[in-house]
Amino acid sequence: MVSFGGFARKIFGSSNDRRVKTLRQRANQITAIEKNYENLTDEQLQAKTAEFRAALAGGKTLDSLLPDAFATAREAAKRVLGMRPFDVQLIGGMVLHERGIAEMRTGEGKTLMATLPVYLNALEGKGVHVVTVNDYLATRDAETMGKLYNFLGLTVGVIKHGLDDDERRAAYACDITYGTNNELGFDYLRDNMKYERAQMVQRPHNYAIVDEVDSILIDEARTPLIISGPLEDRSDFYNLIDTFIPALEPEDFEIDEKQKTAIFTEVGTEKVEQLLEAAGHLKGESLYDIENVAVVHHLNNALRAHKLFQRDKDYIVRNDEIVIIDEFTGRMMPGRRYSEGLHQALEAKEHVTIQPENQTLASITFQNYFRMYNKLSGMTGTAATEAEEFGNIYGLEVLEIPTNLPVQRIDEDDEVYRSVEEKYRAIVRDIRASHEKGQPILVGTTSIEKSEQLAERLRKEGIKEFQVLNARYHEQEAYIIAQAGVPGTVTIATNMAGRGTDIQLGGNLEMRVRQELSDIPEGPERDAKIAEIKADIAQLKEKALAAGGLYVLATERHESRRIDNQLRGRSGRQGDPGRSKFFLSLQDDLMRIFGSDRMDSMLQKLGLKEDEAIVHPWINKALEKAQKKVEARNFEIRKNLLKYDDVMNDQRKVIFEQRLEMMDEEDLTETVGEMRHEVIEDMVALRIPKDAYAEKWDIAGLKEDIISKLNLDLPVEDWAKEEGIAEEEFENRIKEAADKAAAEKAERFGPQIMTYVEKSVIMQSLDNLWREHLVNLDHLRSVVGFRGYAQRDPLNEYKTEAFELFQSMLANLREVVISQLMRVEIVREAPPEPELPPMTGRHIDSTTGENDFDEASWSDHQHDERNVPAAERDPADPRTWGKVSRNEACPCGSGKKYKHCHGAFE
């Protein structure tokens, strides 16, 4: 029975169909003017860029220029690249220009499609970022498509690992910049740790096109980018804790694979308490006493490392390091580390060098980084299953772009076996049969361990012609996958999400030329060799087509339908034939953890014989239902995480904007004056509450505050004895004295040096307090969930307390800045040469008396050190003091010894 919705779609088409129909009409208009552009000379075509820019300067919009700009880019692609964008690629380009996500099947030309909106939007000169998942793709696309952009007079840069700041700045200054999501995000964080705007590398975030957008904005959404600094080395303690876990029995802990949690049972808690006590690391009477919070954290990490994280699935050990493996793509992620001690627990488990824990200096999630762009769009082979998430979180509409030629791939029903062993026997039989008829086969696995187990089975069965692509062989990735379409080739690969390299039947011309002709220079000999390779690939393609095209054989379903669809989509590119099939068992993770209990019992009741499979469309639907449940759960997790991260993100924006304002300020006198007055107002309000009787005043505390925060010794005891004096009068007198001291200091330093000192103190204090604030927010986040047990909304509690922490941080910032500025002095150091004595500005931590940092040296003021009689010394002017003995009374009149007063800063 057809539902009314289904009937309506048949009559009127889906909303996707209607939208495509509208865009196709516009694509037809562009095709209609194609002849006009074909008749232009190269010079006339290149002149179009300047013409379009002049039109924009004259008030025209990008939308009005779209038909002509797309026609220009299409014609340039034909002349420079030898490729003509199809009408469906024009449609995809319009979707990208209009802040959408273009879902385009593998092999349909996403990279070429992107050149159309990239060219159009680059005309504004504000910068266009094309974001890819790895350096190889960023470099490849920048080199290939850069020829097209350069032909049209646009500049192209590429951001990749290993560039210095000058190279990065130059790349970001280009009209078009290719780069990875990681590099762009880290550059943003690093920029917001700089002290001068000239040191920053990025421009404002204008327009980004994200390739493999589902991988970056969905799969990576839970992974924050973090810049961190090392803390103390606790490797011995990690190693000690690690020795406890192998001693545990199954009844000592509980594992929840669905929630990915591991906890100690009561029996297990007693056991580790005994072990800790024997090792002398248990404080108090119980493991859960407040003194043991850090120990419990280490124990939980060690338990997770041993019981939830698997070597060669979640990580590999390489060069004495733990390297994380992306669960979605199977790629290694060197440089990435699990936070909060988990990575150290894994290092202890695998007996590699334990790196020190890190403190977060700056962090941001991809969700919040990419939402900073004025205009964001994306492209991928699979996005429809996550359309709701793209719409809710990023405001991006997903549009499925029709293929240029009909898809001929046959997607067969899944085969389900009772055990993993039976499943693998069936897989080997199927690989052998397809291999013998010369069909290229791509075998998808979910982990390194499983890919290598299957490879070993094939060797034992006498199938030797296969290649393995997983995180261990990451460097050969592009070449291996490019040759996966050669007849008879068997390629075993971990998850194919985001691979970025096309599998072409017969082989990849560009890759073979690079591999075989790298030593032959341009010329007739090279051209002849290329012609031979082309002919060979054409022959091999005919053989592959005759054998049925690429066969995608998957050994397991992934949690995400999207990953499965990406694997299927490797076959049947551009109208080629192909087939796909999934082999499953009841022992697979998805079936075991999330699968339907009814399916399990039903299959067992059928009494299947050994090596017998059940194949039915109902099985596919049941599995899809299980996957939808997982996807919905993961979406809720990401949505919830974003709500918490938005709180920090709002605060991050305030802090980063303040830093930028500080960089641009040429005179901070007014800003610092306001901060000084606010500190004084808070100080007086605390010690002399409004409308309180004089007996309630804390005059001793106020005097202490004035000395510690303002470095002044004022007669507040005498003021308090005056008849009728109120708190406003205290405020005014303290402000007057503090302003006078600050003005005298500014006069001694000179305006240029004073501004530099003020900027340095404010920005470094801000950075230090922001880092502490991030730690405080992490702690708050880790405990606020328990408020739910008290019937309080954890998110609202987090918002309220995070705001209070933020306000407290800003108040603390004012105090720290003013305290340091009221103490900073020019210190004369022994000159290397008498005629050029240097002077150094230092900032002293008022609480420790230690030199907080030493940022600048100046030699444009020159003073001789000499002994000066006390009578000639001006207490307010250290320049008149000359050399003072450290145990002598300080000439400033404070009554303290010089070494405990102004001498403390030398």
Curated annotation (Swiss-Prot):
**Residue ranges of region Disordered?**
829-898
Q: Of which family is this protein a member?
A: Belongs to the SecA family.
EC number of this enzyme:
7.4.2.8
The record's annotation in InterPro entries points to: Helicase_ATP-bd (IPR014001), Helicase_C-like (IPR001650), P-loop_NTPase (IPR027417), SEC_C_motif (IPR004027), SecA (IPR000185), SecA_CS (IPR020937), SecA_DEAD (IPR011115), SecA_motor_DEAD (IPR014018)
UniProt-annotated binding residues for ATP:
Q89, G107, E108, G109, K110, T111, D502
Q: Which organism is it from?
A: Brucella anthropi (strain ATCC 49188 / DSM 6882 / CCUG 24695 / JCM 21032 / LMG 3331 / NBRC 15819 / NCTC 12168 / Alc 37)
Q: Which GO terms describe its biological process?
A: intracellular protein transmembrane transport; protein import; protein targeting; protein transport by the Sec complex
In alphabetical order, the GO MF annotations are: ATP binding; metal ion binding; protein-exporting ATPase activity
Query: Any idea where this protein resides?
Result: Cell inner membrane; Cytoplasm
Query: Entry cofactor note text?
Result: May bind 1 zinc ion per subunit.
Q: Which cofactor does it need?
A: Zn(2+)
State the name under which the record lists this protein: Protein translocase subunit SecA
User: Transport: present as a keyword of the record?
Assistant: yes
* Statement: the UniProt record of this protein carries the keyword Transport: yes
- Which segments cross the bilayer? none
Which class of enzymes does this protein belong to? translocase
The entry's Zn(2+)-binding residues are C890, C892, C901, H902
- What's its catalytic activity? ATP + H2O + cellular proteinSide 1 = ADP + phosphate + cellular proteinSide 2
Which UniProt keywords are given for this protein, alphabetically ordered? ATP-binding, Cell inner membrane, Cell membrane, Cytoplasm, Membrane, Metal-binding, Nucleotide-binding, Protein transport, Translocase, Translocation, Transport, Zinc
Q: Which SMART domains match?
A: SecA_DEAD, SecA_PP_bind
